[in-house]
């Protein structure tokens, strides 16, 4: 400590001696130096304007005057006059030291710096005047160098060094003051000056014991009475998203929403905080859509994005609707190139972080506005699969087929034909009634096994009347084959029925055998047919649809045949016919007592006779004609009974509706024929009693049967052909 004090005293003594010796010389040197500075023109950038020297020395330079003021603010213990004298002395000393070599100047600078390093804070406090002298001397040396080198930047360096020294003195003299607090206040004031907050801005606001929360700024005039009770001067009314709260926040606790989104979004993972961010992002999207909307969009969409409705207890209802957007969301800030680039990058890597949600929402809103301008109401939506394809559940083919909906075009239906599918059960039994159908793909061939499905045609309605059918059957029985007219009327896709050619039966057994061979197959019910078609392993064979006619049709056939047997006109009688009629008259009673089978065989006529004379079986005009006609009626009635017995065993009925209808017809016909049978019996008794009646009565009986023949000829084509042949 003693050495340091001695050094300080030696320095002060040297300064005092220098002041006493060279006042006059220093004044002269300073005057010459001032003149040189004026001639060069560095008055503005130099150390300042110089004045004429007085008795105590030259006036202070402007830079040194400022130094004195700063020293006064830091060191309150020093007097202004004392420091002024010191500064003046230093200025004189600086003028004197101008003529010294540069080595001496460097030595003085080192001494000054050494003193500054070695002096402790308490020493500085006790020797404030001496420390100021040292600091000023250091500044003096710098000024001398600057004056010698003619550099205008020297004063700025001088001021910087002095400020550094002042800071050191500040820290040493008043250690209880905190520099950090002063800097923090300056930063807050600086941030508040930079942030420009306006109404309806989206911001981040801070409340004690809560993270930075997204909110929206409102004007103080929009506050409710409840909110005005918490009003603070110089604060802003902020409504928070999500929880519908509000607060009066100072400018230092408010930050812009967009600039600080990536930083603030990481604060918390609470559901309330995430919901608040989502609501804020929805408002961002609405503002961008409104800012880029054109007049071509629909009114409904425009009203949806035009207004923001705020529900908050701190905002009045009349101020809760905000129309429009903000300046940042307008079309001026829209950059199409950035949008296209972002979409391409997102397509390459679809994943994004939560901190990029603001950018994603903004770009999506811009793309949506562009799509609306193109005429679409919304963006296209695509279904995305999460996870790998290998981890996806496998769907069985059955489930996949059940999920699909099969749609088939309806086939055009025909008005008079219905397509059915039949199955061939036994080829051998059906061979007599079916004709093999050629396969268009495999050529004409006979199939040994089972057929595939084939569509056959079943007429909905009867295409022929019963009278026509009876006439055809009658001709086929005489000719031994089917008529060609029937085969010509069959449709192209329907199979022809194969009829077995045989001789004319001579007995009822042959007739029965003919009926069995004509249709040997058993009827197939629709229910069994449907079950067989639905069976998995069966192959289906085609079968021709048979004509539907029942028992009533058979009975009616015989009745019409009986009426059609009488000719429309009477043939001339010959001798042979009259003899046969006389014989038959005598044996009328015996014929009546014959069995029915013999009566039918007696009635049958040879084929040659039938073809030559179709009406040979009719009754001729003889004197004993009445008994002959009565025997013919007995024969017909016997044939009717025989057919009625054999009819239930036939396999001709396929349609239940037609069967019921034919049964009704058969019951009616049966009653009619029973009446005719009783009438025939009465006629037989009369014929036995009145066998001597004249031929006029017989002719009268023939004339009574003639109208029925006319009716038969009107309903049957075969009868007309017979009349034309005669």
Swiss-Prot record:
A motif (Nuclear localization signal 2) lies at residues 495-502. Residues 1-26, 392-441, 472-545, 568-726 are annotated as: Disordered. GO terms for biological process: epigenetic regulation of gene expression; flower development; regulation of DNA-templated transcription; regulation of photoperiodism, flowering. A motif (Nuclear localization signal 1) lies at residues 460-467. Its main location: nucleus. It comes from the Eukaryota. One of its GO terms (cellular component) is ESC/E(Z) complex. Residues 494-512 have a biased composition (Basic residues). Disruption phenotype: Delayed flowering associated with reduced H3K27me3 level on FLC. The triple mutant pdp1 pdp2 pdp3 has increased levels of FLC, MAF4 and MAF5 expression, but decreased expression of FT. The keyword DNA-binding does not apply. Disulfide bonds: none annotated. Residues 1-10, 658-688 have a biased composition (Basic and acidic residues). Residues 199-260 form the PWWP domain. Keywords: Flowering, Nucleus, Transcription, Transcription regulation. Residues 12-26, 426-435, 606-634 have a biased composition (Polar residues). It is found in: Nucleus. Gene3D superfamilies: 2.30.30.140. Belongs to the PDP family. Interacts with DEK3. Binds to MSI4/FVE and MSI5. Component of the PRC2 (polycomb repressive complex 2) complex which regulates histone methylation on histone H3K27. Together with PDP1, PDP3 and PDP6, interacts with MSI4/FVE and MSI5 to suppress FLC, MAF4 and MAF5 expression by regulating the function of the PRC2 complex and modulating H3K27me3 level, thereby promoting flowering. This is PWWP domain-containing protein 2. It comes from Arabidopsis thaliana (Mouse-ear cress). The gene is PDP2.
């Amino acid at each position: 400590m003693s050495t340091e004090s001695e050094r300080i005293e030696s320095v002060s003594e040297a300064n005092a001696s220098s002041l006493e010796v060279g006042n006059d010389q220093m004044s002269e040197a300073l005057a010459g130096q001032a003149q040189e500075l004026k001639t060069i023109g560095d008055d503005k950038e130099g150390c300042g304007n110089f004045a004429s020297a007085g008795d105590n020395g030259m006036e202070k330079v402007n830079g040194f005057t400022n130094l004195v003021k700063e020293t006064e603010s830091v060191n309150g213990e020093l007097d202004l006059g004392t420091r002024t004298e010191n500064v003046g002395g230093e200025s004189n000393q600086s003028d004197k030291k101008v003529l010294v070599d540069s080595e001496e100047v460097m030595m003085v600078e080192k001494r000054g710096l050494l003193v500054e390093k070695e002096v402790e804070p308490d020493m500085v406090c006790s020797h404030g005047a001496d420390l100021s002298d040292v600091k000023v001397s250091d500044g003096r040396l710098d000024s001398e160098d600057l004056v010698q080198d003619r550099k205008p930047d020297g004063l700025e360096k001088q001021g910087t060094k002095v400020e550094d020294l002042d800071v050191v003195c500040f820290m040493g003299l008043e250690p209880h003051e905190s520099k950090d607090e002063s800097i923090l206040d300056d930063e807050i004031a600086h941030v508040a000056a930079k942030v420009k907050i306006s109404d309806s801005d989206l911001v981040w606001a801070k409340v004690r014991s809560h993270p930075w929360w997204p909110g929206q700024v409102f004007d103080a005039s929009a506050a409710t009475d409840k909110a005005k009770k918490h009003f603070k001067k110089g604060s802003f009314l902020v409504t928070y998203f999500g929880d519908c709260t509000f607060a009066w926040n100072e400018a230092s606790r408010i930050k812009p929403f967009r600039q600080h989104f990536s930083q603030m979004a990481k604060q918390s993972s609470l559901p309330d905080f995430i919901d608040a961010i989502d609501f804020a992002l929805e408002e961002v999207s609405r503002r961008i859509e409104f800012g880029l909307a054109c007049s071509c969009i629909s009114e409904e969409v425009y009203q949806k994005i035009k207004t923001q409705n705020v529900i908050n207890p701190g905002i009045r209802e009349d101020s809760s609707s905000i129309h429009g957007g903000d300046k940042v969301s307008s079309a001026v800030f829209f950059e199409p190139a950035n949008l296209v680039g972002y979409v391409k990058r997102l397509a390459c890597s679809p994943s994004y972080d939560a901190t990029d949600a603001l950018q994603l929402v903004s770009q999506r809103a811009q793309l949506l506005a562009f799509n609306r301008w193109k005429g679409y109401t919304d963006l296209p939506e695509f279904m995305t699969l999460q996870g790998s394809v290998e981890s996806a559940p496998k769907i069985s083919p059955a489930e996949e087929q059940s999920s699909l909906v099969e749609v088939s075009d309806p086939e055009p239906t025909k008005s008079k034909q219905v397509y059915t599918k039949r199955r061939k059960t036994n080829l051998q039994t059906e061979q007599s009634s079916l004709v093999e159908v050629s396969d268009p793909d495999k050529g004409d061939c006979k199939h040994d096994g089972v057929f595939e499905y084939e569509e056959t045609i079943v007429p909905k309605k009867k295409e022929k009347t019963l009278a026509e059918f009876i006439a055809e059957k009658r001709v086929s029985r005489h000719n031994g084959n089917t008529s060609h007219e029937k085969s010509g009327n069959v449709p192209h896709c329907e199979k022809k029925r194969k009829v077995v050619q045989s001789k004319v039966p001579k007995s009822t057994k042959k007739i029965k055998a003919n009926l069995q061979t004509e249709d040997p197959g058993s009827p197939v019910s629709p229910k069994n047919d449907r079950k067989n078609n639905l069976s998995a392993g069966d192959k289906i064979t085609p079968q021709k649809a048979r004509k539907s006619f029942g028992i009533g049709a058979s009975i009616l056939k015989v009745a019409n045949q009986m009426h059609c047997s009488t000719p429309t006109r009477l043939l001339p009688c010959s001798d042979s016919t009259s003899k046969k009629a006389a014989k038959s008259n005598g044996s009328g009673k015996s014929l009546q007592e014959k069995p029915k089978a013999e009566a039918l065989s007696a009635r049958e006529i040879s084929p040659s006779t039938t073809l030559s004379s179709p009406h040979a079986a009719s009754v001729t005009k003889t004197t004993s004609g009445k008994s002959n006609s009565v025997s013919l009626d007995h024969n017909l009635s016997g044939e009717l009974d025989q057919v009625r017995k054999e009819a239930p065993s036939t396999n001709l009925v396929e349609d239940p509706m037609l069967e019921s209808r034919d049964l009704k017809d058969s019951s009616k016909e049966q009653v009619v024929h029973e009446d005719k049978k009783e009438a025939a019996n009465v006629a037989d008794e009369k014929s036995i009693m009145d066998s001597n009646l004249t031929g006029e009565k017989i002719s009268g009986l023939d004339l009574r049967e003639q109208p029925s023949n006319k009716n038969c000829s009107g309903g049957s084509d075969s009868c007309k052909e017979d009349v034309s042949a005669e």
